[in-house]
Amino acid sequence: MGVVAPNGHGLDVFAQALREGRSGIRHIPELAELNFACQVGGVPEGFDAIRQRYFDHEKLLSLNDNIGYASVAAVDAWTDAGFAVPEAEDDRVDWETGVIAGSGIGGMDTIARTVVPMVNAGNVRRMGSRIVEQVMNSGTSARIAGLLALGNQVTSNSSACSTGNEAVIEAVARIRLGLATRMLAGGSEGASPYIWAGFDAMRVICRKFNDRPEEASRPMSASAAGFVPGAGGAFLLLEELESALVRGARIYAEVLGGMVNCGGHRMGGTITAPNPEGVRRCVRGAVADAGISPREIDAINGHLTATYADPIEVKNWSAALERGPEDFPWINSTKSMVGHCLGAAGAIECVAVVLQLRGGFVHPSLNCGDLHPEIVPYERRIPHSAVACPDLKVVAKAGFGFGDVNSCLIFRKWEP
């Protein structure tokens, strides 16, 4: 696995941040200068220095933040899995491995900062030959394929907040069908006022706590004031089990099953709100695909964005799993530490799930000491500090996005 998150780059740093409940949310001066109501965000620190360690000058010319976060995380996942990054001069192609790399908004920053001003100024010819690969939606997957010589399915997906989860589910399906041995799957999103402006205009991102950034992301809290925008990237290398065992790979966890669906913008569902029945069907479908009982789920890493939808989500989990407050699984929100990383959210949070399974702990959900009244019945299953769970075996990970789209994954700790 590989991760570039607002509160840490690399698995060890990120895992420690999760255990400690360390926030990566900071004040963003540019947002204040541009009169944003929300002036905080989750942005990976020191990324320019990080990517310069990975890529030569020529490659850096075509790496905006969206592609950069994805490329670093994918290379990290590749090497963590025990593979070497091939030399550019090596003509061999790995036909058994592909990549699905998603993003929610993609190259918007490059379009706004470079394409629009230069076109409006009549300077089209000065944009250079690298601009298209930075703004095309498949720029992330294409770049990763070139870095690692991948020859199987190489595509980019986009399903708003569900993107990262969906990439993993699609990759698992590809392997199950016998069409690939391995797939890199994940997502990324750049950090930019041009990406976040629409959400600020909608008043769905946090307009309070600008002077207390680490308190701004408040999933499940009665004082939640909207989500905090974030950025970053993460990838998981998924591999057919026999192949992984034969090569002696380090296996962190199994993907038991997954489900994607849409609520059809009915029964209360809209572009910006989920159809509760669609959410419940998605969770039940993932559990069925995993071949387990709902009672085997030990913990939930929720979508939980710090909006009005949080109590609705908790109730949907309870209904879908048929587990009330008395026997509800642990539930937490990684977004309380990193914000909502949009197309990268599901991928970063999947890595968080696997690290919790591997480490036998449930990370804290920050800033929810004042639980929403409708969530209070579940309070004993909401960790405010890290909880040691040596018997943690099965965790559900969900993503519910704009467009009334839903995704749910079931992970199980690997036990040979």
PLM features: residue spans?
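ACP-dependent fatty acid/polyketide chain-elongation machinery
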Residues: 1-60, 81, 242-254, 351-366, ...
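Glycine-/small-residue-rich "gating" segment that lines the acyl/pantetheine channel
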Residues: 17, 122-128, 169, 173, ...
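Condensing-enzyme catalytic core mediating Claisen C-C bond formation in acyl metabolism
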Residues: 22-27, 212-290, 298-299, 368, ...
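Acyl-CoA/ACP chain-elongation machinery
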Residues: 29, 179-225, 260-273, 302-311, ...
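A glycine- and small-residue-enriched flexible loop/hinge segment at structural boundaries
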Residues: 30-87, 101, 110, 137-151
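Active-site-proximal alpha-helical scaffold in enzymes
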Residues: 70-83, 137-140, 145-148, 154-188, ...
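Phosphate/pyrophosphate-binding loops at sites that engage ATP/ADP/AMP, CoA/4′-phosphopantetheine
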Residues: 77-93, 244-251, 282-299, 321-324
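Active-site-proximal gating segment of KS-fold condensing enzymes and close homologs
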Residues: 103-155, 201-206, 309-324
